[in-house]
A protein has these predicted regions:
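A short acidic (Asp/Glu
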Residues: 21-23, 104-112, 144-148, 188-191, ...
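Acidic/histidine-rich catalytic neighborhood
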Residues: 225-249, 253-256
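Structured alpha-helical segments in the cores of large, soluble enzyme domains
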Residues: 43-48, 70-88, 103-125, 150-178, ...
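Conserved, mostly hydrophobic/aromatic
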Residues: 4, 135, 224
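Acidic, glycine-enriched catalytic cores built around paired aspartates
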Residues: 11-13, 18-20, 32-66, 75-79, ...
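Active-site-facing alpha/beta catalytic cores
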Residues: 1-120, 124-132, 141-142, 173-175
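C-terminal structured domains
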Residues: 136, 148-151, 186-195, 201-211, ...
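A generic structural motif
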Residues: 120-137, 161-169, 219-220, 324-325
Length: 455
């Protein structure tokens, strides 16, 4: 109330596919495309064009020429940023976040669009961008590819020029930010596989960034429920991989959790204290304590793969989407106006296009809480039955590993919240008996396997 937004900085976030479409329109307007779209080019062709163009200061088009809706939208945004920097500097501006980053070309395209808008600057050493371009890794595949993408991006001349300018300005090592998505990775492969992929990715990304004389700063895109990455803040900090917290971090707070945590003075003080104290404590451990290798990593690799397979087998069960659309209130959520973003990324009626927010919310409303537990029980039961020695080793590691304690406790809380009677009642809304029984049977078996393992 006293300061409003005066001390805040503004991030700009856009989907990689939107950027690619914008560049395609620019290239076509400049007469640099034949019948083939830039989107259809091979990765090698795209990289060759990007490297060539990023060595040149000239834009594609003269000012005032429209290239297409996506191109005009991105360039208008970047021109506003360039004007702000010209008048006031970079204070108040954050990062250019690229959601659904799949490959390094998704990040280099942003440099080229920034050059076109006059946001990127030409220096004697080449092009540099005054605002950091930040990858957002959201799916399991992208998290696994993340370290390689960041390595290629940080080795690129434009990124090196940009980091060198920051290093000179700060008089020390700059920070390099990476955003990791908890919601979409969970929707992609289930909670256990998602959490393990995030843990491994942050560890590998930290090592990659440190090798380039920069400090890793992770932006944790967490939601307000376990299925979207939520959990006790201090446990979350304790569970972060060693070296991933260097004194600075970011995380999202959802609208509903902001009111819950900070609407009243006493709760605001309590939650702010937990956040700052746990961040300071974890940073001190990461700086001064020696990293402790997790002895059961190979077991967790297999457990994650098993839980992912169980989760995806449910999603690929014949008739699953028909069951989902009838047994949950997803149709009401899609037509509601309560969210800040549309329920689907591009409007396509597919599971891949559905955002994680309505996905988790709909299962919660039907009291399945499926994104918070499905797949974990099946994987643990298989481990216990087929490899009892590994299961015993995992149980022993639970007493020592903050990561395991955090993840399994969150899964347990989701399992306790699920209501089997209400699940059966909602499943009864599905008119096709074959579909209803096939999906309900898969969910019921998973719940039965989960319960004795966790309870």
């Amino acid at each position: 109330q006293a300061f409003g937004f005066h001390s805040a900085s503004l991030d700009v976030r856009q989907n990689s596919a939107f950027h690619e479409k914008a560049l395609d329109q620019l290239l076509r307007a400049a007469g640099l495309l034949d019948e083939r779209s830039f989107i259809d080019w091979s990765v090698e062709e795209k990289r060759a064009l990007l490297d060539r163009e990023l060595r040149s200061p000239r834009p594609f088009l003269s000012p005032g020429i429209s290239a297409g809706p996506e191109a005009d939208t991105v360039l208008a945004c970047h021109r506003v940023l360039a004007a702000h920097i010209h008048d006031f500097g970079t204070s108040g501006l954050g990062s250019l976040i690229v959601s659904m980053t799949r490959r390094v070309e998704d990040l280099l395209i942003v440099y080229l669009l920034a050059r076109e808008a006059g946001l990127a600057e030409w220096t004697p050493k080449g092009l540099r961008c005054p605002l950091p371009v930040v990858p957002l890794f959201e799916t399991m595949g992208d998290l696994e590819a993340g370290p390689g993408i960041v390595e290629a991006f940080m080795s690129h001349p434009v990124t090196q020029n940009s980091l060198a300018a920051l290093r000179e300005k700060l008089g020390g090592d700059p920070s390099f930010q990476v955003m990791v998505g908890y919601s979409d990775s969970n929707k992609d492969c289930g909670i256990f596989a998602s959490q393990w992929a995030l843990h491994r990715a942050q560890k590998a990304l930290s090592e990659t960034i440190t090798q380039h004389a920069a400090k890793p700063v992770f932006f944790h895109g967490r939601g307000g429920t376990v299925g979207r990455g939520a959990g006790p803040t201090h446990w979350f900090m304790d569970a972060l991989p060693h070296g991933s917290l260097s004194g600075s971090m970011r995380m999202t707070e959802q609208g509903e959790t902001i009111a819950q945590k900070y609407a009243h003075f006493s709760s605001a003080v309590y939650n702010a204290e937990i956040l700052m104290a746990s961040a300071a404590s974890a940073t001190a451990r990461h700086r001064h304590a020696k990293p402790q290798a997790l002895a059961v990593e190979h077991i967790l690799d297999g457990l994650a793969a098993s839980s992912r397979d169980a989760y995806r087998s449910l999603l690929h069960t014949e008739g699953f989407m028909a069951f989902y659309r009838t047994a949950t209130p997803i149709d009401a959520l899609e037509n509601s106006r309560i969210g800040s973003r549309p329920s689907r990324r591009t409007g396509q009626a597919s599971l891949d296009d559905l955002r994680a927010i309505p996905w988790v919310f709909s299962w919660t409303q039907a009291r399945f809480y499926l994104p918070g537990w499905f797949g974990a029980g099946s994987a643990l039961k298989s481990l216990r039955d087929e490899r009892p020695a590994d299961y015993k080793a995992l149980a022993g590691a639970l007493r020592e590993s903050a990561f395991l304690k955090y993840v399994l406790t969150n899964i347990e809380s989701s399992l306790v919240s699920a209501n089997a009677n209400l699940m059966r009642a909602y499943a009864g809304l599905v008119p096709d008996e074959t579909v209803r029984e096939a999906v309900r049977a898969a969910g019921g078996v998973a719940l039965e396997r989960c319960t004795p393992v966790f309870m």
